[in-house]
Amino acid sequence: MLRKHVLLVEDDLNFGSLLCRVLQRAGYNVDVAASMAEAKEFLTLTQYAVVIADWRLSDGDGTVILGWASQLGAKTALMSAYLLQMPGGRSFDHETLTKPIPPQEVVSLVQRAIGTPTAFST
C-alpha cells in the first residue's frame, strides 16, 4: 500500500519546510506549494488525502484551494494567524488551525482526518 499523501500550501518557506519534515517523519508523503498557482498544479497531478492551506497567500485566498481540494475528495484544513478576523468568524467546512501552530498539532490533525500512515515492512 502507498503512504497517504498530504498537500501543504504555505508561502512562508521556513514554516512550510518545518511542517513538511514533521509530517514526513510521521510517515506521510508531503508536497509543499508556496502559492495558489503551485497548489492548483499539484492538485491536477496528485490525489491528496489531506490538503492544509494558509489563508493569506501571496497570490490569493487559501480557502479557494480548499474548495478545489474538497471537490476532489480531500479532507481540508485552514491555518492562519488571522482566523478571528475572517468574515463569518470560525464557521468553516474544514478544520482550522490558529498560528502559531505546534508542529505536532498538524500531525494530530492529519491522523484524525485519515489515520496513521501505512507501515512498510522491510
Segments the model singles out, each with a brief description of its role:
Residues 63-74, 83:
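Short amphipathic alpha-helix used as the core "switch/output" element in two-component signaling
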Residues 58:
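The feature encodes the CheY-like receiver
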Residues 101-122:
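C-terminal output helix
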Residues 54:
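Active-site residues of response regulator receiver
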